[in-house]
UniProtKB/Swiss-Prot annotation:
Pfam families: FtsJ, RlmM_FDX, RLMM_N
GO BP annotation list: methylation; rRNA processing
Gene designation per UniProt: rlmM
Alphabetized PANTHER family for the sequence: RIBOSOMAL RNA LARGE SUBUNIT METHYLTRANSFERASE M, RIBOSOMAL RNA METHYLTRANSFERASE FTSJ DOMAIN-CONTAINING PROTEIN
Enzyme superclass (EC): transferase
HAMAP family found in the cross-reference section: 23SrRNA_methyltr_M
Enzyme active site: 306 (proton acceptor)
Family note: Belongs to the class I-like SAM-binding methyltransferase superfamily. RNA methyltransferase RlmE family. RlmM subfamily.
Keyword Repeat: no
Keyword rRNA processing among UniProt keywords: yes
Protein name per the record: Ribosomal RNA large subunit methyltransferase M
This protein's UniProt keywords: Cytoplasm, Methyltransferase, rRNA processing, S-adenosyl-L-methionine, Transferase
Signal peptide: none
Length: 366
């Protein structure tokens, strides 16, 4: 199995392909990407037969920006007979996966695939039963075993394969299912909520998104991102010349500062979170974020980088490399992750977490 399917946002196939070609090459796994415009997925075909499995084992999925999900697959199954689609699929997976922990029958996230998605949901139940009988799936769902993927690209036409549950997206089609809160001031609130789900392990939420923390929201108006922080009972400085939603101000948890987010300097030294979703050139935002991190003004940050029309992967890579270089220059250890989230459009969301030193007394430990 030498092919890896990567699901992505439709229209960003070239960026996804450029990224996987670059990062697979750094792992000395060579191949080429098959790209179809607006398909919502990319296929990376490795030159060596076993390299597909090697790639999804060795390259951290968390290091990918434009892929929502990935899995290794075999050859395309075509012309599945409508009266029995199950037998050929089971045949393709036998000997490839044994006692898988979960089945996901998926499609690309395109308008054309919506009808196909309805079929996939109905088809999952009988297929799961057949795969369990064949030993491809375990008799119960478990996160400790590989995930079995059946990926339909057209009616009667699918790829079959698997991903490793410790190195994939835990979400179906790589998309967290979030509901827009009726009392949120703007739909942008879902970007930050999704970022929390993608970047912060669920078992660390109570510690890292704790009650009573102090946070700053740069470019906050009307308060979509502030809403998420308030919902987690944080105290928030919302920085923007534009007005904040009255519903947020009424909570008593928000201090509205009518200032430019680029000029604001915090007066507290116990700020846990800084978030930022400003419409500005990505290099300018990256420089501001680096300044906050280098000065120890916050412990963690989530921010958006708006993408240019061309060379998007190169631009994001350059911005992330700049932040990393600034941190390295000042001897600061940090973890950087970036992802084009489902709720992002022409942008990517970045999470940076400073890793505290064991030696006390430094400003960045306050």
């Amino acid at each position: 199995m030498n092919k890896v399917v990567l699901l992505c946002r439709p229209g960003f196939e070239k960026e996804c392909a450029a990224e996987i070609t670059d990062k697979a090459g750094r792992q000395e796994i060579f191949g080429f990407a098959r790209v179809k415009e607006n398909a919502g997925y990319v296929i990376y075909e490795c030159y060596q037969a076993e390299d597909g499995d090697k790639l999804i084992r060795e390259l951290p999925f968390s290091s990918l920006i434009f892929a929502r999900q990935w899995f290794v697959v075999g050859e395309l199954l075509q012309h599945l007979p409508p009266e029995d689609r199950i037998t050929p699929i089971v045949g393709m997976l036998q000997g490839v996966v044994e006692k898988g922990g979960e089945l996901r029958v998926e499609v690309a996230d395109t308008n054309e695939s919506k009808e196909l998605l309805k079929f996939c949901r109905k088809f999952t139940v009988p297929l799961r039963a057949a795969l369990r009988d064949a030993g491809v799936l375990a008799n119960y769902e478990t996160p400790k075993r590989p995930v079995v993927h059946v990926f339909f690209i057209a009616p009667g036409c699918c790829y079959t394969g698997y991903s490793y549950s410790n190195n994939n997206s835990p979400f179906y089609m790589g998309i967290p299912r979030l509901k827009f809160p009726a009392d949120a001031p703007s739909r942008s609130t879902l970007k930050l909520e999704e970022a929390f789900h993608v970047f912060i392990p669920a078992d660390e939420w109570d510690e890292r998104l704790a009650n009573g923390m102090w946070a700053v929201d740069l470019g906050a108006c009307p308060g979509g991102w502030t809403y998420q922080l308030v919902k987690r009972n944080m105290w928030v400085y919302s920085v923007d010349n534009g007005p904040m939603a009255q519903s947020l101000m009424d909570t008593g948890q928000v201090t509205w500062l009518r200032e430019d987010g680029f000029k604001f300097r915090p007066t507290r030294n116990n700020i846990s979170w800084m978030v930022c979703d400003m419409v500005e050139k990505p290099a300018k935002v990256a420089a501001l974020m680096a300044q906050w991190l280098v000065n120890g003004w916050c412990r963690e940050t989530i921010f958006n980088l708006k993408l240019p029309m061309k060379k998007r992967y190169e631009e994001v890579s350059h911005n992330l490399a700049y932040i990393q270089a600034q941190l390295d220059e000042h001897g600061i250890n940090a973890q950087i992750q970036a992802r084009q989230l489902y709720h992002d459009r022409e942008e990517v969301t970045v999470h940076v977490r400073r890793i505290w030193a064991a030696v006390g007394g430094r400003r960045d430990e306050r």
